[in-house]
Structures are given as C-alpha cells and as structure tokens.
C-alpha cells in the first residue's frame, strides 16, 4: 500500500484537466470489447483525467456504449493514431486487440514511437502474442516498456526469445523467477509476470514481489485492469522519479499488483464465485478512498503528536 500511496498525485485547486493523466488504450476488436473497456475503466476510477481508446471500427459503438467517460477512436491505422499519441502521457496496447496479421505494421510504428519519445508503455494480451510471433523485430532499448504476461503468455515469450520449450511445466517459483530475469535481460524490457506471486523484473536483475492476498476467482478481465492501472502508475511514477525507469517500473508494478489483488479480494469476499471484473472495478474507488482516508488520519495523528 505504501508504494501505491506514494504515487497518488495530490489534488489541489491549481490542477488543470489532464494533469493527472492522459492515457491511451489501444485494443478492441469485433470479438473483444470488454478488455479495452476494463483497462480504460480502471484508469478512470483511479483518477486519470482523459482516457482515449483506439479500437477497430466494429468495436467502437459498443465501447462508447459502455461508458461516456471514454474518448473512443474507431480505426486501427498508424496515420490516424500516431499523431494523437503525441498528447498521451502513457500508452497501453493489447487488451482485446485480436490477432489480425494486418495489425503488426501498426504495432511496429507504435514501438518505434515509444522508443523515440520515451512514453510510459505497457504491452499486454494480444500485444504480447504479436511480440512472441515477431520476436526478432522487437526493438532494443525500450526503456519505458513493461510486458505483463500471465504464465501462458510468458511461456510463449520464453520459447521465442530464449528457446525454452517447457515453461508451462515449471513448478519451481525460483526457476520461474530465473527465467523472468533471463527474459528481461534478453529482451531489454521489464517483465511483470502475473501469478500466485506477482514478479516485477527489470533488465538489471532487480526483482520486486507482491504476494498480497487476492481473489480465488480467476475471471477474465483482471489482467486488463492490471494493464490499465499499470499504465497510469507508470506516468505518475515518472512524474515523481524522472528518467529513473528502473525505480519507476518497480514502484508502478508493485502498486498495480497491490491494487488489483486487494480490489479482487474485496470483491471475492462479498460475492464469492459470482465475483467478476465489473465487481472488482467497483471496489477501486472505495479502495483509493480508504487509502487516502488512512493517510489523512495518519497525518492528523502525526501533527497532533508534535504539540
């Protein structure tokens, strides 16, 4: 919780619209409209000011209908997306993206944009599938980038980048951590590996872990909430830490892990096996408020102790 609390920007009368975050989510297809919504909605509930969703034309009306808070852009072509990315504070690519091969050139342009402009960047879901399929073309020195694989996505990345064929059968947590460190070094990016214990591994070998109790329900969409919240936290961490991307990735990664695991646990405690991702999202505003209220109480207690 302390990592999360450190990242929350102070709300003051001097803030302007956009100061707390302008975030882009790139994903959404005919089949998958929930994933980009979950990623974007998590960002909205955490307090980002402007959330843009870039999606396939077939997905746009559906995503628009989910929430009036989101700015939805239909069309998945570089000429329309890249100029708008110049205004974004962080980019999340992959939730509900789909695997249409025609998307790969767009992703290559986005990767190059991120590398050159050093924008906080998260690759999740189908974005990771494309990276696995085109590992030899993934750029080096993507210093702002975090990959967020689950175990299946992690196994694909390890097979493509490291030649490891049997990762799904690895049971040892220390061996998985070793593979995550090898993958991070080989790809020169941070790996946020989701699992029973979440790992954040940076290319220099540093490892952070989060084992906060989480939901026992493994419903779809929790990874999208992780990706969205991580994107916003990366921006907030950058504001606090400047270009110290290693520290920013650890602070943001552990904050995202704690948030999603805690919100999921609260939702599961209330709803049991009926818990789903919308119910998890509903817990985020309450969780943020609880953290801020605790901070205010601690501050008042500290001030009182001085007199």
UniProtKB/Swiss-Prot annotation:
The EC number(s) this enzyme carries: 4.2.1.93
Any one Gene Ontology BP term: metabolite repair
Catalytic activity: (6S)-NADHX + ATP = ADP + phosphate + NADH + H(+); (6S)-NADPHX + ATP = ADP + phosphate + NADPH + H(+)
Source organism of the structure: Caenorhabditis briggsae
Positions bound to (6S)-NADPHX: 96, 150-156, 224
Taxonomic lineage: Eukaryota, Metazoa, Ecdysozoa, Nematoda, Chromadorea
Lineage: superkingdom: Eukaryota
Binding residue positions for ATP: 194-198, 214-223
Assigned keywords, A-Z: ATP-binding, Lyase, NAD, NADP, Nucleotide-binding, Phosphoprotein
Cofactor requirements of the protein: Mg(2+)
Protein task: Catalyzes the dehydration of the S-form of NAD(P)HX at the expense of ATP, which is converted to ADP. Together with NAD(P)HX epimerase, which catalyzes the epimerization of the S- and R-forms, the enzyme allows the repair of both epimers of NAD(P)HX, a damaged form of NAD(P)H that is a result of enzymatic or heat-dependent hydration.
Protein name per UniProt: ATP-dependent (S)-NAD(P)H-hydrate dehydratase
A Gene Ontology molecular function term of the record: ATP-dependent NAD(P)H-hydrate dehydratase activity
Family statement: Belongs to the NnrD/CARKD family.
Pfam families per UniProt: Carb_kinase
